[in-house]
C-alpha cells in the first residue's frame, strides 16, 4: 500500500517539481493550497495544475476569514512588529497553513507532510517546528532544501517530467503574499545599496504619484479589533481588503529594512503592508486614550516578546498562550473610533474618541481657569514622590556636595 503525503502547494516551480519527485519516492501526494488572500492568484488553475503534474488529490481551502480573525487580530491587539518594523506578514500565515496540513494529514491517514522551503530562510523552521508540536510522529519531506536544487536543475527536472515552467520564471524576485501584506526579496534587492525599483512593489503607489489631497477614514474598534470602516460594519477580512486598497493608493505601508533572520543571517526585505500600517497606528492611538498608565508602559515589553515568538516559529508555545492572555485582558476597554489621515506615504491619527472607556478627562487636563485639577496638592506629592532619592543623595552625595558644618 502506497503511503500518503500532504504537500503545502503554491503552484510555483518549487512545489510543482516536488510532486513528481515525491511520487517517484513512493508517495501518493495530496496537494493543499490555502487561500490566505494572495493577490492576483487563480487558485482554481493552481488546483488543476497540481493534478496535472501528478497529485492524487488537490484541495483549495478558503482560509481568509480564519486568517484574519485568529491570526491577524492578535497581531493588531498586541501591536506586534518584529524589530520595530515588520508586521509579521509571512510569519503569520505559516501556523495556520501547518494547522490545516496536519488536520488533512490526519483525516487521510497520511504519514508525511512536505514543504518547498529552502535552507536559507525562516520558513523551514516555522513549518517544521509547528509540525513537530502538533504531531511529533509526522514525517517531514523538504525536497528543495534537502537536495539543494539549482534553478537550472529544477527547470531540467520539470521538463523531463512534463511540469509546466511558469512564464514569470525570469522574474528576479521571490514573493510571498497574504491578506496582511506582501514580502519581496532576492534579485537586485539582495544588494542593500540598491534602491528597490518600482517593479518590486504591487500594492502601493509611489509617493511621488500618490494623490496630492489627503484622505480621511474612521476606524472603529471593539476590544482592540477593527470592526467598522467609516461607520460601516465589516468583517475583519473585508475591512483589511478595503483599507489595503485605500491606503495603498496613498503610498502607505512600504517597508525597506535589514532583518535578522531566525537562521542567523541578515537579509534585505521589502514589504508592503498598507492596512497594517493604518490599523496598527490607529489601534495604538486608541490604546493611548483607554489604557491605564502602568498597563500602557508594561504592554510594549510583552508586545516585543510576542513578535519574537511569532517570528521565531513559537506560535504554538505555552509562553505565547500566556502572553496573549495578558494582551486579551488589556483589550477589553480598547473601544472607540480613530480618525486617520492618509497622505503621501503617511498614516497619521488626527482624532479619537471612546464614549465609555476614555481615560482622558478634559476638566482635569485643561489649562484654563475651569480646570478641576487641584494644583495645590502637587507640592506635597512632589516631596513624597522624590523622598527616597532625596534621602539617598543626602546620605551619599553622588551628585552633590555635602554641606559644611559651621561652628559658631
Swiss-Prot record:
Q: Which HAMAP family match?
A: Arg_succ_synth_type1 (MF_00005)
What family name appears in the similarity comment?
A: Belongs to the argininosuccinate synthase family. Type 1 subfamily.
Q: Which GO terms describe its molecular function?
A: argininosuccinate synthase activity; ATP binding
Q: What stretches pass through the bilayer?
A: none
Which of this chain's residues are annotated to bind L-citrulline?
A: 86, 122, 126, 174, 259, 271
**Pathway of this protein?**
Amino-acid biosynthesis; L-arginine biosynthesis; L-arginine from L-ornithine and carbamoyl phosphate: step 2/3
Q: Which GO terms describe its cellular component?
A: cytoplasm
Task: Identify the enzyme class.
Answer: ligase
Q: Return the protein name.
A: Argininosuccinate synthase
Keyword vocabulary terms for this entry = Amino-acid biosynthesis, Arginine biosynthesis, ATP-binding, Cytoplasm, Ligase, Nucleotide-binding
Q: Which reaction does it catalyse?
A: L-citrulline + L-aspartate + ATP = 2-(N(omega)-L-arginino)succinate + AMP + diphosphate + H(+)
Q: How does it assemble?
A: Homotetramer.
Positions annotated to bind ATP: 8-16, 116
Query: Which positions are annotated as binding L-aspartate?
Result: 118, 122-123
Its BP terms in the Gene Ontology are: argininosuccinate metabolic process; L-arginine biosynthetic process; urea cycle
What's the gene?
argG
**Where does this polypeptide localize?**
Cytoplasm
Q: What EC number(s) are associated with this protein in UniProt? A: 6.3.4.5
Amino acid at each position: 500500500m502506497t503511503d500518503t503525503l500532504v504537500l503545502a502547494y503554491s503552484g510555483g516551480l518549487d512545489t510543482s517539481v516536488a510532486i513528481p519527485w515525491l511520487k517517484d519516492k513512493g508517495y501518493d501526494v495530496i496537494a493543499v493550497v490555502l487561500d490566505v488572500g494572495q493577490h492576483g492568484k487563480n487558485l482554481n488553475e493552481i488546483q488543476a495544475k497540481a493534478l496535472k503534474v501528478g497529485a492524487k488529490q488537490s484541495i483549495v481551502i478558503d482560509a481568509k476569514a480564519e486568517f484574519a480573525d485568529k491570526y491577524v487580530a492578535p497581531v493588531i491587539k498586541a501591536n506586534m512588529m518584529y524589530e520595530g518594523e515588520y508586521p509579521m506578514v509571512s510569519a503569520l500565515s505559516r501556523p495556520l497553513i501547518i494547522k490545516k496540513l496536519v488536520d488533512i494529514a490526519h483525516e487521510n491517514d497520511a504519514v508525511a507532510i512536505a514543504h518547498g522551503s529552502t535552507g536559507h530562510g525562516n520558513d523551514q523552521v516555522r513549518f517544521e517546528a509547528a509540525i513537530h508540536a502538533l504531531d511529533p510522529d509526522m514525517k517531514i519531506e523538504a525536497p528543495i532544501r534537502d537536495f539543494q536544487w539549482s534553478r537550472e536543475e529544477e527547470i531540467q527536472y520539470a521538463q523531463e517530467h512534463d511540469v509546466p515552467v511558469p512564464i514569470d520564471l525570469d522574474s528576479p524576485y521571490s514573493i510571498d503574499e497574504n491578506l496582511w501584506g506582501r514580502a519581496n526579496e532576492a534579485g537586485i534587492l539582495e544588494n542593500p545599496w540598491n534602491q528597490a525599483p518600482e517593479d518590486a512593489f504591487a500594492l502601493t503607489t509611489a509617493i511621488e504619484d500618490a494623490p496630492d489631497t489627503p484622505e480621511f477614514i474612521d476606524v472603529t474598534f471593539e476590544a482592540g479589533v477593527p470592526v467598522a470602516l467609516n461607520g460601516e460594519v465589516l468583517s475583519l477580512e473585508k475591512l483589511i481588503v478595503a483599507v489595503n486598497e485605500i491606503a495603498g493608493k496613498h503610498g502607505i505601508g512600504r517597508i525597506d529594512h535589514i532583518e535578522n533572520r531566525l537562521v542567523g543571517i541578515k537579509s534585505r526585505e521589502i514589504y508592503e503592508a498598507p492596512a497594517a500600517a493604518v490599523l496598527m497606528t490607529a489601534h495604538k492611538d486608541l490604546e493611548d486614550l483607554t489604557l491605564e498608565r502602568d498597563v500602557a508602559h508594561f504592554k510594549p515589553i510583552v508586545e516585543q516578546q510576542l513578535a519574537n515568538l511569532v517570528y521565531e516559529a513559537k506560535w504554538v508555545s505555552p509562553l505565547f498562550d500566556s502572553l496573549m492572555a495578558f494582551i486579551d485582558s488589556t483589550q477589553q476597554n480598547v473601544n472607540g473610533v480613530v480618525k486617520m489621515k492618509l497622505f503621501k506615504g503617511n498614516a497619521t491619527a488626527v482624532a479619537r474618541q471612546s464614549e465609555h472607556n476614555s481615560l482622558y478627562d478634559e476638566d482635569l487636563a485643561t489649562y484654563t481657569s475651569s480646570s478641576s485639577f487641584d494644583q495645590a496638592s502637587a507640592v506635597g506629592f512632589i516631596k513624597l514622590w522624590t523622598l527616597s532619592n532625596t534621602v539617598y543623595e543626602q546620605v551619599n552625595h553622588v551628585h552633590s556636595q555635602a554641606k559644611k558644618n559651621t561652628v559658631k
